[in-house]
Regions:
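N-terminal secretory signal peptides and thylakoid transit peptides that target proteins
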Residues: 2-17
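Conserved hydrolase catalytic core segment
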Residues: 113-148
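Conserved alpha/beta-hydrolase catalytic His-Asp/Glu region
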Residues: 153-155, 162-219
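Conserved HGGG/HGGXW glycine-rich cap/lid loop of the alpha/beta-hydrolase fold
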Residues: 40-84
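Active-site loop/oxyanion-hole signature of alpha/beta-hydrolase fold enzymes
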Residues: 73-113
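Catalytic histidine-centered segment of alpha/beta-hydrolase-like enzymes
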Residues: 257-265
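Conserved loop-alpha-helix segment in the C-terminal half of the alpha/beta-hydrolase fold
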Residues: 223-257
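Flexible "cap/lid" loop of the alpha/beta hydrolase fold
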Residues: 137-166
Length: 279
């Protein structure tokens, strides 16, 4: 596994953080969490938006503004894009985050909302769909197995990821290297290197593919392809094979685009959002 700046590696995502508020009714108690903050915007059907690794909710700003008639719940993971890490500083990350978002859904009184997740957020969205918390799920440019995004498997890459995480967070040289990566990655400059390393470790050890047959909610998968036809065909085949276990899943390539499809192809991505939310 290389630590280069390939846009399709696990170290992806960007965007500015927005102001994080609880926007419930006047009698509602604030949602307090040491793992996430939530911004609520708009009125209408509920949609939960989860950004990717080292990203803030700002990645969704243009889309949220273009889609009135929905109440968007923008998740901001602590440790990413300017928020202090707090409970995300050490230990497992992905499963606790999924549990915390599920707790928010319950606390806010949401009834099986639509959930859209980009990159790492797509993994969290899938977990919420599998747990019955989401009414429908859109995954943006993420495979069921995080390691597969760099051509590995959870069994093969997981051990390496454990060692890599220890190196990046437990040695002076590793921390310097991770700091350099963070400094060079758009959207990650204000993210905590420890949280990024923990997220990479968790993602490399997660494979939700075997659980897809028990997913009972509608699933849309949007993925980025480049301008090279042969490469686009290979990526499309890879995604279709990875999601074959999800009966009725709708897969849509979008391109030419890099990993941040909402920025590279905003009009086409907005059209896919409309189709997903109208279902």
């Amino acid at each position: 596994m290389t630590m280069g700046m390939n846009r399709r590696t696990l170290l992806m995502g960007g965007g500015a953080a927005g102001l994080t508020l609880w926007a419930g009714g006047a009698s509602a108690a604030p949602f307090v969490s040491r793992r996430i903050d939530v911004t609520v915007r708009g009125n209408g059907r509920d949609v939960v938006l989860i950004p990717g690794l080292a990203s803030g909710p700002g990645i969704w700003s243009g889309l949220v503004a273009a889609l009135p008639g929905y109440r968007f719940h923008l998740i901001h993971v602590r440790g990413f894009a300017g928020l202090a890490a707090q409970a995300n500083q050490s230990g497992a990350l992905i499963s606790p985050l999924a549990d915390e978002i599920a707790r928010y859904i319950t606390a806010a009184g949401l009834k099986r909302p639509a959930v859209i997740g980009h990159s790492m957020g797509g993994t969290l969205a899938l977990k919420l769909g599998l747990s019955g918390r989401a009414g429908r799920v859109m995954v943006v440019d993420m495979l069921p197995a995080g390691a597969a995004m760099v051509g590995g498997t959870a069994s093969g890459l997981g051990f390496l990821a454990d060692q890599l995480s220890s190196y990046l967070t437990g040695t002076a040289a590793g921390r310097r290297y991770l700091a350099q990566i963070v400094a060079q990655t758009p959207g990650a400059k204000n993210s905590d290197p420890d949280v990024i390393a923990n997220a990479l470790r968790d993602l490399a050890n997660i494979d939700l593919g075997p659980q897809l047959p028990r997913l009972t909610v509608p699933l849309h998968v949007v993925f980025a392809v480049g301008s090279d036809a042969q490469q686009a065909a290979a990526i499309t085949r890879r995604f279709r094979e990875a999601y074959a276990g999800a009966k009725g899943a709708l897969l849509k390539p979008i391109g030419p685009s890099g990993h941040m499809v909402m920025a590279d192809q905003p009009a086409r991505f907005l059209a896919l959002w409309r189709m997903f939310l109208a279902g």
